From Swiss-Prot:
Domain SAM-dependent MTase PRMT-type: 307-620
PROSITE patterns per UniProt: SAM_MT_PRMT
UniProt region (Dimerization), positions on chain: 477-493
Family designation: Belongs to the class I-like SAM-binding methyltransferase superfamily. Protein arginine N-methyltransferase family.
UniProt protein name: Protein arginine N-methyltransferase 5
Keywords: Chromatin regulator, Methyltransferase, S-adenosyl-L-methionine, Transcription, Transcription regulation, Transferase
UniProt function note: Methylates arginine residues in proteins such as small nuclear ribonucleoproteins or histone H2A/H4.
GO terms of molecular function: histone arginine N-methyltransferase activity; protein-arginine N-methyltransferase activity; protein-arginine omega-N symmetric methyltransferase activity
One term under GO cellular component: nucleus
Enzyme class: transferase
GO biological process, one term: regulation of DNA-templated transcription
Keyword Transcription recorded: yes
Natural source organism: Dictyostelium discoideum
Chain positions covered by the region annotation Beta barrel: 465-642
Amino acid sequence: MINSAQYEFSCGVELESVDIQLDIERAYDLEYQFIMTSISHPRFNRDFTKASIGNSFSNKVAFTRSDTLLQSNYWRSSIVGKTSTNGIDLDSIDPTIRSNSVKTLKQEISWAAHLSLPSILLPTPSFNSTNYAQVVNQSLQSLSYMKVWIRIPLVSPKSQLLNKFDYYQDHNTSGGSGNNLVDNDNPWEWWNNFRLLCNQHPNLSAVLEMTSDLPSKEQLQQWLGEPVKCVIIPTSVFLTNKAGFPTLSKAHQQFLLQLFNYNIQFVVSGASMDTLKDYKTYLKFLHTNQNPLTQEEYFEMPYLDFLQAPLQPLMDNLESQTYEVFEKDPIKYKQYQNAVRLALLDLDKKDSKDDPIIIMVVGAGRGPLVNSSIQASIEANKFVKVFAVEKNPNAIVTLRNRIIMEGWEEIVTVIDSDMRDWNTEYRADIMVSELLGSFGDNELSPECLDGAQRYLKKDTGISIPTWYTSYIAPISSSKLFNEVTAYGDLKHSETPYVVKPHNFHQLAESKPLFTFSHPNRDEIIDNSRYESLEFELTIPSTTCHGFIGYFDCCLYKDVHISINPSNFSTGMFSWFPIYFPLKQPVYFSNGNLNNNNNNNIKAKCAFWRNVSKSKVWYEWCLLSPTITPIQNVGGRSYYIGL
């Protein structure tokens, strides 16, 4: 049985530590992995209102403990530092308070870096924390090891108070600048403003603080596209069961179960040492009792959020290990076998050993579709002759050996040729291919099949697949955006990537984009395409980092293979989605729109599929709520060679 969790459970405890050595030992005894505690000593006080806060920054009085209290490996692995919160205000209108706050934060960040702490937790920003962000951004430039965490509540204190007294609805409908009020009171907006001012630095992450009230489901899902590294769970959020032990509401449990699928640490806050173990035991129980990983999820784990360049099937030959991965798919070839069987049964032809049904497998690879076709003929009780057309000379070697091993010599003929160049007098009753990419047509299935369809019987020939459609949707994913940005050049920001997205939030349901049908009987075949699509977002505000692409393919009649979420072929893992990045993230907000019918965000994009004599490429852009430059103009950064 496959383990039930993708990631190990890591849980710490937040406390104000006077004796840090003793508290670490206690935490370990209670099976916590680390403690989260203030960098400055809890007995050290500063007066931020004084023009000079004297000994606070002098060498006469130490503001914290000595680094020699613990060995360096404990500082590096067992402690997350917290900066001061009492009295600190880096955006105060009082210049004295502001200046002293800046000095304090810089001093504590410097000390945390000196200790080699893995992470440092900073206080919650407000909607306008410009100076606070500037100080943090400066520090981020010099931190090579330590990560900076920003504490963000799921629901703002103001909203929690209003919910408690049941005034929230009146508060939102009492007139005035309602949209601005919602934005200013939305913790995601605080986080978004802060990280944008810090240029989305990859070492800056959010720490979510659970609240008794939870925001809407859409707003919770929004955090799945953000760089959340830790979740703090105050004991006040827990309920007590009949046995007197802590438990969480169903809504909190459901959100936690989602978070367990990410590499996130957890922290219990507000408990006394006497009750700490009960909270850890409960959270560990939830983590352990997840559903086991499916074979598909287990296979996908190493590829989560890992960017891969799409294949160039006509320019490059696939390697043996690539074929091997594709051939392990438990769903794809069963569906092909079903499609071929139905097609064989539908053919109005009397077959015999001397006059068999002709099946051409174009792009045969190492033979999985050949096998599916033969198995389908056995099920349909039909005599067939199979031509296996393949351009890769290395795959040809495997294919010829397989024919001998399987005893297919009387059934299968291997054609060592590009399907577009092969000449034969035979005409196929059925043409079978698996030339699809993550976006359907992005591995040149239309161009390949258009070149090969001259071998298909004109009036009665059947193509498998019959048609396929690409789908697209806007997404938010700081992770994917930062992965692309790390390359630091134009080429990578205009390249689509095959990826199994994990740390992302799809902002709307995907919509169909380009469709191709086979055989294509148009007198003049044109595989270039242009479409613009509009999406309606129900979330009040978000950041768009690009688009995620899928495909749905009809092999024959009602037999489909699909990676589109709405009709995904469960268990199939031959294809991951495709990610089209935007060069810069784009902020969406319903507060910026004047919709008459509702306040939902309307986002519109445009996509082009361009074709020349030597290459095929995509171009894309955003059209609303703001216009972005068209990317990959003329295929300057990425194309698929013909």
